[in-house]
Amino acid sequence: MKVILLKDVKTLGKKGEVINASDGYARNYLIPKGFAEEANKTNLHIWNNKKEAERKQKLAEIEAAQKLAAELKGKEINLTVKSGENGRIFGSITGKDISDELNKKFKINIDKKKIVINNIRQLGTYDVEVKLYPEISTKIKVIIAEK
């Protein structure tokens, strides 16, 4: 019996694959447990439509991330903080601080988790990476000045 795997099954294959399984194994285990469904015309058509919709959504997300990366490229933000002697700041600059400043200055809303930042504990200029999508990232310049 041909079945479409709905989940990864260690011994059979990955989600979305159409495989041949014995009738008893498919009817008594795979289908009732939700690991697979019968591979008839209707289910194959539904599965192909779902895959196509996911592919289109992924392309739209990549396009939006590339557009945002182009918009962010070369942007510069200024943060003013209290500092002690030798230019050492009190506390540290976080992704949330940078995200809030980007939103305030450029009206660009970026999740703080997408901002890759090392510990910034000194006054100065830093290049900060913003990961918008797994393979799409850009750098912005962050200038830390004393209040």
UniProtKB/Swiss-Prot annotation:
Gene Ontology terms describing biological process: translation
Cross-referenced PROSITE patterns: RIBOSOMAL_L9 (PS00651)
InterPro entries xrefs: Ribosomal_bL9 (IPR000244), Ribosomal_bL9/RNase_H1_N (IPR009027), Ribosomal_bL9_bac/chp (IPR020594), Ribosomal_bL9_C (IPR020069), Ribosomal_bL9_C_sf (IPR036791), Ribosomal_bL9_N (IPR020070), Ribosomal_bL9_N_sf (IPR036935)
GO cellular component, one term: ribonucleoprotein complex
Pfam families to which the protein is assigned, alphabetical: Ribosomal_L9_C, Ribosomal_L9_N
Assigned keywords, A-Z: Ribonucleoprotein, Ribosomal protein, RNA-binding, rRNA-binding
NCBIfam families, per the entry: L9
Free-text function comment from the UniProt entry: Binds to the 23S rRNA.
HAMAP family per the UniProt record, alphabetical: Ribosomal_bL9 (MF_00503)
Family: Belongs to the bacterial ribosomal protein bL9 family.
Protein name: Large ribosomal subunit protein bL9
Organism per entry: Clostridium kluyveri (strain ATCC 8527 / DSM 555 / NBRC 12016 / NCIMB 10680 / K1)
